[in-house]
């Protein structure tokens, strides 16, 4: 990882180079790097009496394979979530938007490279990698929201802007994405 530097025997992460891939967490021999824990923030949202929705990553099925979807959703509601919805709904929204953008681009600019190259914005770590390591390709990143952001917007449009959305999934990069686009 190009963002990890060793200075005076200690590894540090250079924020300007970090693409949020999580390699520093998995490769640190001293186990000094950790994924940020947002349990306190989530509990604060519950305590404020807000409607808090869980946006559940599709990977939940492999992480909680001993439980049915219904059991997991019921457990999350017992913890205080108002409702549970799969982030995959956001992926459907993004797929439709991508198809529309692709059709528009190919109709307007059939001979241009822009009509032939589309880089998905679905993965915030990939987007950061392109912006930091391959900036010449940044213009080809679609302006679609990521599935997480599309899902959060859908929930807020459906249930009101005053509700909160908490992403539950394994992706470190989505934590920063949620910070940038609350």
Where are these regions (language model features)?
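Iron-sulfur-associated redox domains of electron-transfer enzymes in respiratory
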Residues: 36-182
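Iron-sulfur cluster-binding cysteine motifs and their immediate structural context
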Residues: 1-19, 23-39
């Amino acid at each position: 990882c190009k963002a990890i530097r060793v200075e005076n025997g200690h590894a540090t992460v250079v924020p300007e180079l970090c693409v949020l891939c999580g390699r520093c967490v998995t490769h640190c021999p001293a186990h000094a790097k950790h994924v940020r824990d947002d349990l306190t923030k989530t509990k604060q949202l519950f305590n404020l009496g807000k409607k808090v929705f869980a946006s559940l990553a599709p990977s939940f099925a492999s992480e909680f394979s001993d439980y049915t979807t219904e059991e997991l959703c019921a457990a999350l509601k017992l913890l205080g979530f108002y409702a549970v919805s799969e982030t995959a709904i956001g992926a459907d929204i993004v797929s439709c938007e991508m198809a529309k953008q692709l059709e528009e681009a190919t109709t307007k600019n059939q001979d241009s490279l822009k009509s032939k190259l589309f880089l998905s914005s679905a993965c915030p770590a990939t987007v950061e990698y392109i912006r930091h390591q391959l900036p010449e390709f940044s213009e080809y990143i679609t302006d679609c929201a990521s599935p997480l952001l599309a899902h959060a917007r859908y929930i807020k449009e459906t249930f009101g802007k005053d509700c909160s959305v908490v992403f539950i999934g394994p992706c470190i990069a989505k934590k920063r994405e949620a910070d940038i686009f609350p």
